């Protein structure tokens, strides 16, 4: 066997292994970028020796064979994959190939859309009624997931409108919004269930359940992006026209679809989407660029596994492989001890990553992680990098177990893990320097007391020099004392003192959030402030009374009650008030006198809003007598669903709660 034959055999075997893990087992072991690199290497070798290309080479087919647990559906029109480009130069080369093949010097009109990171499916409608659905599988044969797809509320069981074809097969992506993914994992950690590495794995695992009742509980959604079978009807002669027609028939289509009349316009779209990526609420890994004209698509045709008229322009990889060199333990403001992996530095999504959170002891056990392991690191948007999985097939011989500390690594106090909780905590309280630092950093943060110019390094020095022990001590600082800190001149010191003085005027909700009560985030703090109105009323509340507040259950109510029952906490609050911290007296709203459909209602916002910010929407709703909650419960009267609404929308539908969209909310606000 020639050396190149050996290389080809090894590459094909490796790629088939990873295709099986990705497409069949929903448990990928390597990042997409590494798979793409291996595929490029195989293509390049096959280009050198086309006589060695085999029919079953991964370059000649799509995906992997389907699971035998599902019935199989043969695709009458193959579900092909897309070729990829990874930089501007490669895209411009693709654009030129298209123009050359069309023998045209004029710019092609491109239809650009999002490349969703979910599971490709085909859905067949006969006379407008959903009759079957299948996964991509190997592109020729997929798995019959009809029963599961019927549980996805975004997918219509019957199309509506005129001129619906007798047989119409739509293609699209089933995916899981970020909020739904976090809720699934949160529930799994609480119940000891399977924790998913990323939303794509969660979507695939949810869609390919043998029991559709499990799928029905998962907040999956769907966007349509193409067509397979078309019989007994017609569709528009452009890709965008077809998407708009699908939308008119009731099929969900992404609103981020744009026509571009030049290569530069495509690049602008790519960069704008890349910038907006962290705020979309769901995962994408690039944009898809298609020739808009169906006539030109037919003229361009296909290669073995992909169309010549479309390409996926992928973003820089958000996942990379590296090694865990050590694990250290950090202490947070509530005493939570968090293991942090120290990594061999690696570039991920344009950022050099050398640390990744490991969350807790359960996560380390779930991963089966040891120091020295080769791991996959993921960094999405502004999220702290995390270890996705261990590459067990490449585990080095010299690895060692991770041992959780029995004493606080900062103050030496005992650590404890309360039954039913995943977190291990230091019991040292404010005698622990780490907890003191983190509590003060939280207190001055932008969404809390918002002390401009007081960064982490200043807090670190103030605690280390014992200038500050409690939040009230901050307001006693003088410019003279601050000037003694590193890199703090007289002008900067005075600016910090001025910022502290300005921060004394706050709101009741911000003040509560700044106190750092366990489990009390911004939304809960706002709910407590709105419900009780005054600090005195809140401090006097019983656990039962606290649970009357939207989103406050027994756990949160107990934490709030215990916080105010602690004499040292009441003392700190008294000192803060004595130093001049204040907020406006509550405005008593008589909902009986407000003529608004929102008056007296408990309202939940979910998804992203396009017409106004979430804060503005909350403010207007509260002004009209509504109580804005952060989660859906039986107490909820109304849910307002924006784009990419996730688990909250699903729960509202399960509970039979009224749901309106953003347009209807604005109409009612302006009524």
Swiss-Prot record:
Record-annotated BRCT domain positions: 593-671
Protein name: DNA ligase
EC numbers, comma separated: 6.5.1.2
Catalytic activity of the protein: NAD(+) + (deoxyribonucleotide)n-3'-hydroxyl + 5'-phospho-(deoxyribonucleotide)m = (deoxyribonucleotide)n+m + AMP + beta-nicotinamide D-nucleotide
Entries under InterPro entries matching the protein: BRCT_dom (IPR001357), BRCT_dom_sf (IPR036420), DisA/LigA_HHH (IPR041663), DNA_ligase (IPR001679), DNA_ligase_AS (IPR018239), DNA_ligase_CS (IPR033136), DNAligase_adenylation (IPR013839), DNAligase_N (IPR013840)
Superkingdom assignment: Bacteria
Function of the protein: DNA ligase that catalyzes the formation of phosphodiester linkages between 5'-phosphoryl and 3'-hydroxyl groups in double-stranded DNA using NAD as a coenzyme and as the energy source for the reaction. It is essential for DNA replication and repair of damaged DNA.
Protein family per UniProt: Belongs to the NAD-dependent DNA ligase family. LigA subfamily.
């Amino acid at each position: 066997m020639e050396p190149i034959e050996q290389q080809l055999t090894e590459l094909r075997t490796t790629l088939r292994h990873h295709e099986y893990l990705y497409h069949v087992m929903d448990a990928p072991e390597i990042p997409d970028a590494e798979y793409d690199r291996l595929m490029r290497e195989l293509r390049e070798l096959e280009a050198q020796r086309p006589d060695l290309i085999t029919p079953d080479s991964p370059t000649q087919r799509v995906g992997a064979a389907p699971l035998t647990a599902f019935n199989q559906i043969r695709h009458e029109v193959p579900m092909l994959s897309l070729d990829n480009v990874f930089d501007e130069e490669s895209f411009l080369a693709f654009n030129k190939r298209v123009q050359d093949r069309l023998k045209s010097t004029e710019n092609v009109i491109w239809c650009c859309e999002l490349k969703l990171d979910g599971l490709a499916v085909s859905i067949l409608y006969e006379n407008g009624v959903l009759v079957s659905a299948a996964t991509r599988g190997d592109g020729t044969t997929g798995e019959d997931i009809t029963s599961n797809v019927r549980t996805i509320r975004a997918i219509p069981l019957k199309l509506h409108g005129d001129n619906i074809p007798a047989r119409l097969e739509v293609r699209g992506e089933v995916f899981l919004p970020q909020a739904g993914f976090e809720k699934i994992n949160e529930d799994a950690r609480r119940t000891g269930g399977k924790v998913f590495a990323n939303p794509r794995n969660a979507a695939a695992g949810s869609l390919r359940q043998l029991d559709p009742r499990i799928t029905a509980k998962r907040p999956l959604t769907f966007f349509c992006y193409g067509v397979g079978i078309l019989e007994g009807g017609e569709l528009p002669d452009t890709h965008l026209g077809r998407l708009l027609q699908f939308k008119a028939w009731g099929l969900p289509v992404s609103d981020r679809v744009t026509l571009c009349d030049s290569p530069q316009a495509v690049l602008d779209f790519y960069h704008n989407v890349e910038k907006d990526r962290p705020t979309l609420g769901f995962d994408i890994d690039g944009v898809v660029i298609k020739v808009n004209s169906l006539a030109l698509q037919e003229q361009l045709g296909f290669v073995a596994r992909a169309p010549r008229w479309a390409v996926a322009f992928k973003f820089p990889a958000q996942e990379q492989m590296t090694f865990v060199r050590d694990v250290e333990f950090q202490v947070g403001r509530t005493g939570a001890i968090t293991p942090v992996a120290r990594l061999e530095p690696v570039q991920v999504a344009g950022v050099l990553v050398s640390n990744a959170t490991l969350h807790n002891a359960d996560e380390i056990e779930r991963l089966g992680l040891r120091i020295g392991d080769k791991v996959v690191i993921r960094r999405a948007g502004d999220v702290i990098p995390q270890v996705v999985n261990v590459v067990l097939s490449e585990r080095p011989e010299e690895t060692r177990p991770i041992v959780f500390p029995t004493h606080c690594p900062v103050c030496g106090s005992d650590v404890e893990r309360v039954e039913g909780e995943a977190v291990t905590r230091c019991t040292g309280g404010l005698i622990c320097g780490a907890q003191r630092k983190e509590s003060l950093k939280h207190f001055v943060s932008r969404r809390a007391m918002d002390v401009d110019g007081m960064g982490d390094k200043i807090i670190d020095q103030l605690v280390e020099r014992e200038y500050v022990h409690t939040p009230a001590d901050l307001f006693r600082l003088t410019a003279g004392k601050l000037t003694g800190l590193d890199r703090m001149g007289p002008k900067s010191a005075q600016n910090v003192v001025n910022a502290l003085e300005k921060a004394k005027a706050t709101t009741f909700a911000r003040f509560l959030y700044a106190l750092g009560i366990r489990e009390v985030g911004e939304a809960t703090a706002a709910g407590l402030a709105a419900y009780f109105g005054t600090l005195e009323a809140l401090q006097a509340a019983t656990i039962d009374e606290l649970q009357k507040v939207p989103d406050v259950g027994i756990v949160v109510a107990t934490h709030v009650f215990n916080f105010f029952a602690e004499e040292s906490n009441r003392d700190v609050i008294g000192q803060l008030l004595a130093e001049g911290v204040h907020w406006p007296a509550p405005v008593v709203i008589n909902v009986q006198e407000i003529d608004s459909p929102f008056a007296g209602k408990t309202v939940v916002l979910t998804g992203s809003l396009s017409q106004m910010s979430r804060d503005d929407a909350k403010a207007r709703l509260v002004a009209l007598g509504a109580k804005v909650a952060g989660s859906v419960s039986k107490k909820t009267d109304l849910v307002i669903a924006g784009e990419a609404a996730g688990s909250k929308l699903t729960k509202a539908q399960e509970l039979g709660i009224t749901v309106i969209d953003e347009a209807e909310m604005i109409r009612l606000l302006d009524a």
